Amino acid sequence: MPAFSPEQDAALKAVAAWLKAKPGRGNAPLVFRLFGYAGTGKTTLAKHLAQGVKGKVLFAAFTGKAALVMRRKGCEEASTIHSLIYKALDNNAQQPRFELWNDSPASDAKLIVIDECSMVDAELGRDLQSFNVPLLVLGDPAQLPPIQGGGFFTDGQPDAMLTEVHRQAQNDPIVRLSMDIRAGRRLIPGEYGDTQVVTRDRLDPKRVLGADQVLVGRNVTRRAYNARLRERRGFAGALPVAGDKLVCLRNNRRKGLFNGGLCVVKERPKPRRQILRMRLHPDEDITDRMIKVSVRPECFTGQIEQLDWPVRKRFDEFDFGYVLTVHRQQDINTSGFNGNDGEAVPE
């Protein structure tokens, strides 16, 4: 049995008392919020608690990358929330539509553990709660809130809060740097394991071009960098072409699209009556599933906000996904470059 700190032990006792009170029945709430900074042991505590539950415990996260990280940390069969509680209406693998899966594995679970809970919006949160299964949600108060949506579980105060970073976790470069930032210390340029802190004038543009994901602070920088990276990759024109990387801007439950999800354009888009019709493959989907979408070209020219909502709501919304703002993408488990809105990619 691992040795827990007094803070962690108090959190374990609080969750155990909540479970003993039979959440969803009586006065115990259905949701327990276990929050803490990176490296404080949220996942470790969740795994330990799961071992003491008599019955099925399920682990899930908003993104596929986060679910994979949970698996690597020992959370067996961790999945995306979407795959856990929704099912395809038909067997058409090329274009399935989804609905709430009332008989899903979640329906008879004794506990569901949700990671990166700040990304869960009201609709997804209510669908999770509809199974009336106790929800242990894990969150990090240091994460920036999503620009839109999300925050369904983080609107309330934590039931237990972890602030002490483990000694082992302090050796992780990302955790170490995040601690310095929270303490108000300036980052010192240098190498921290596989992580580098560099000044703007010393940044190698090749590192930016080779990164899995580029993150910046402002939308104006995001648009400029997306244009440059597309140009450097040989993609001409203002509109998407086959091979382009896109990010979803609005949920579409029926198609299995979620705000912040990344996709790749698989075929040349077909413009029709000022509408782009595209076939996309979800970036984190290991199947051959294709999604047909209809998108206004204004999404890619920066003019989508000029359209009235009754016009916009009939279509899916995407933008180029090579560069995202830190609000849009907070999954640090990629090989990426986090920029400070400076010049990183040459003209």
What are these regions (language model features)?
Residues D115-E116, G139:
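Walker B catalytic acidic pair
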Residues L276-E347:
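C-terminal accessory regions
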Residues Q51-F59:
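Post-Walker A helix-loop "phosphate-sensing" segment adjacent to the P-loop in P-loop NTPases
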Residues A60-D108:
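Inter-Walker segment of RecA-like/P-loop motor cores
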Residues L45, L49:
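Hydrophobic positions on the alpha1 helix immediately C-terminal to the Walker A/P-loop
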Residues M1-A10:
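Dynamic helix-loop-helix/coil hinge segments at AAA+ ATPase domain boundaries and subdomain interfaces
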